Amino acid sequence: MQNYKYDKAIVAESKNGGSPALNNNPRKGGSKRVLLICLDLFCLFMAGLPFIIIETSTIKPYHRGFYCNDESIKYPQKTGETINDAVLTAVGIVIAILAIITGEFYRIYYLKEKSRSTIQNPYVAALYKQVGCFLFGCAISQSFTDIAKVSIGRLRPHFLNVCNPDFSQINCSVGYIQNYRCRGEDSKVQEARKSFFSGHASFSMYTMLYLVLYLQARFTWRGARLLRPLLQFTLIMMAFYTGLSRVSDHKHHPSDVLAGFAQGALVACCIVFFVSDLFKTKTTLSLPPSAIRKDMLSPVDIDRSNHHNMV
């Protein structure tokens, strides 16, 4: 009877990661849960802080000069965009979160997988982890992008059209022109200095590649072997088209788009493999030998155990 009570205590402790304090003191467990959630939100805020500061402040990009014969910045400014910022953000985030909601629902309620999170509801815990990791990567990707834009200050392909400098006051024979004044609208001129690297390319590649890897980890149905590769191909092509549209819209140079693709892919891989648990090996919780009830063992095993104890 004493061994049986000890077994029940071990099983109860294992429900909360082997911590009897959390089982006996729900208030302490709740305060710890709130503290961990606040810490996660703080980390998410800090990851996106550079992006927030740059987008909401008057920080101006690096004032880069130009060559009068540079044909790469003489393109006309197009009205409108093939894919504007609102569409990019809405589609990228909505598709990703809907996919995560569906995938975690299938994993928790259909495959009956459990979560070791301090959050009691396993579905809520799974959503919290996966959506949180995804948004954390979004914040990192956008912060990287904006830091590069203001630090490098590369001129967009339509820069001269937006800047509209007074060439009568510029001596093009000196080569590289640094002292010049733009007659165009200042806000548009500052935006025309943020070519490297493409934010559309980096954000679209991050969100779509994250989804590709998420499908690889969660989409385990073997009924149609080509369905998952088709979905993954479609997602990558959506990101690819988004980046290419920035070149045809005269918003970015091809190298800006390639750099954006590389940055988005790098952040997605780092988040998936080093932050999330999508590809981590699942471990099963095993009880210590002392928690095994002796009445469930055969007489041979009991004699063998007694022999080892005597030795």
Curated annotation (Swiss-Prot):
Residues 55-85, 145-194, 245-258 are extracellular. Residues 245-256 are annotated as: Phosphatase sequence motif III. One of its GO terms (cellular component) is endoplasmic reticulum-Golgi intermediate compartment membrane. The active site is at 200 (proton donors), 252 (nucleophile). It catalyses: a 1,2-diacyl-sn-glycero-3-phosphate + H2O = a 1,2-diacyl-sn-glycerol + phosphate; 1,2-dihexadecanoyl-sn-glycero-3-phosphate + H2O = 1,2-dihexadecanoyl-sn-glycerol + phosphate; 1,2-di-(9Z-octadecenoyl)-sn-glycero-3-phosphate + H2O = 1,2-di-(9Z-octadecenoyl)-sn-glycerol + phosphate; a monoacyl-sn-glycero-3-phosphate + H2O = a monoacylglycerol + phosphate. CDD domains: PAP2_wunen. A motif (Dityrosine basolateral targeting motif) lies at residues 109-110. It is a multi-pass membrane protein. N-glycosylated. Contains high-mannose oligosaccharides. Residues 1-33, 107-123, 216-226, 280-311 are cytoplasmic. The record marks 256 as: Stabilizes the active site histidine for nucleophilic attack. Its EC number is 3.1.3.-, 3.1.3.4. Residues 276-311 are annotated as: Mediates interaction with CTNND1. Magnesium-independent phospholipid phosphatase. Insensitive to N-ethylmaleimide. Inhibited by sphingosine, zinc ions and modestly by propanolol. The modification Phosphoserine is found at residue 19. InterPro entries: P_Acid_Pase_2/haloperoxi_sf, P_Acid_Pase_2/haloperoxidase, PA_PP_rel. It comes from the Eukaryota. GO terms for molecular function: ceramide-1-phosphate phosphatase activity; delta-catenin binding; integrin binding; phosphatidate phosphatase activity; sphingosine-1-phosphate phosphatase activity. The integrin-binding motif mediates the binding to integrin alpha-5/beta-1 (ITGA5:ITGB1) and integrin alpha-V/beta-3 (ITGAV:ITGB3) and is required for the function in integrin-mediated cell-cell adhesion. This is Phospholipid phosphatase 3. It comes from Bos taurus.
